[in-house]
Each structure stands twice: as C-alpha cells, then as structure tokens.
C-alpha cells in the first residue's frame, strides 16, 4: 500500500522494540523513524543475493510482510502498512 495514501501504523510491540533495541530509542520520534525506514529502507531486491535470501526468510515468518534494511536495523511491515517489529542487523550486506 502506498504510504502517501495509507499511513503507516505502529504496533505497540514494535514501539517497545524500538525503545529496547534502538540507541536512545526512548527519545526518538518513532513515527518519523518508521516513515523514514519505510521510504528509504533497502528491500530484498537491493541487497546481495545471500542477504536477499535472509530477508525473504524473515518476510515469510511474518505472513509475507516486507522486511526493509534501514540504518543497521531490519524493519518489518505488514501488507496493511503496520510496522510489526525490528531487529538489529548483523547479517544483511548491501
């Protein structure tokens, strides 16, 4: 879904993960970070083949969501533009 038409929602679980895993997460503008990750994050089409397989595996674990690499983290979004969770990236190479 186009985020310019359908805004991106942030699940409570995802917001907690930002606070836990992102440096200085409690002082961030969560909505801005999520919008930037969605707009500028790298998908499985923009990374190396090995990393692409890893991102696609994550996507299948989240009911075919979208995994985007942004600022050394992997952000996972649902098909309905809901930010579900995030992981620190230690595997994916651009």
PLM regions: where:
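Ribonuclease/tRNase effector modules and their secretory precursors
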Residues: 1-94
